[in-house]
Amino acid sequence: MPHPPSAALSLPRNGFTLKRFFVAHDRCEMKVGTDSIMLGAWLPLRGDERHILDIGSGSGVLALMMAQRSTAQVDGVEIEPGAATQGQENFLASPWPTRLTMHTLSLQAFSAGCGRRYDLIVSNPPYFAPGVACRTAARATARYTDSLDHAALLRHAAELSCEDGRLALVLPVEAAESVVSKGMTHGWHLLRRTAVRDRADKPVRRTLLLFGRIPAAVQSNTLDIRDDSSEYSCIFRNMTKDFYLFF
């Protein structure tokens, strides 16, 4: 992620400072990273969103980005209590405390008890299949799909979505095709796909996906984070300039 120049002002060290809000993440197993910032900046908003849901919210960075970009009520759902508490603290410290709410429970429990339907659902979901043990149970919950596999995410997102709702995800490239295929099973039609590379001469490492309940022509493109001189590319800068402090 972009770092401040050496002569820049001193910033808090327990989180990440963006242009309009600060995200404390020292009590969250998964820290603020480029993937969430990309997803929150990349996805196109229609402008009429009333309710937005961030699944696996963690520190709340995606929910906060949605609050900055819209006038919607934004809910986060996070199963890990420590992360959920810090996410709620971040919400309360933001410019939009009345529009942000964190729910501390599993997506399965949230979906079963939620009477609301969402215009937009966003998620940077767990991405590793269960394997090598993590240092803590909280980190395993944040990283491994056994706590929330992609099929369950797609199914519950469909249950929580409006009839014309949309779902935006960021995934490792190796998981993207499977999620697109599984999405069709749950009525999610791919609308937009962006392949993300560190640089033009590097392999694709992440995929940004936008699904809708209503089918439409698929838009596909590629995003290079850095240019040939290893500086942040103009496209990446323009996409994230409302958030990154030093763009």
UniProtKB/Swiss-Prot annotation:
GO terms for cellular component: cytoplasm. It is found in: Cytoplasm. Pfam families: MTS. It catalyses: adenosine(37) in tRNA1(Val) + S-adenosyl-L-methionine = N(6)-methyladenosine(37) in tRNA1(Val) + S-adenosyl-L-homocysteine + H(+). Its EC number is 2.1.1.223. Its main location: cytoplasm. Keywords: Cytoplasm, Methyltransferase, S-adenosyl-L-methionine, Transferase, tRNA processing. GO terms for molecular function: nucleic acid binding; tRNA (adenine-N6)-methyltransferase activity. It is an enzyme of class 2 (transferase). GO terms for biological process: methylation; tRNA processing. InterPro entries: DNA_methylase_N6_adenine_CS, SAM-dependent_MTases_sf, Small_mtfrase_dom, tRNA_Adenine-N(6)_MTase, tRNA_adenine-N6_MeTrfase. Specifically methylates the adenine in position 37 of tRNA(1)(Val) (anticodon cmo5UAC). Belongs to the methyltransferase superfamily. tRNA (adenine-N(6)-)-methyltransferase family. This is tRNA1(Val) (adenine(37)-N6)-methyltransferase.
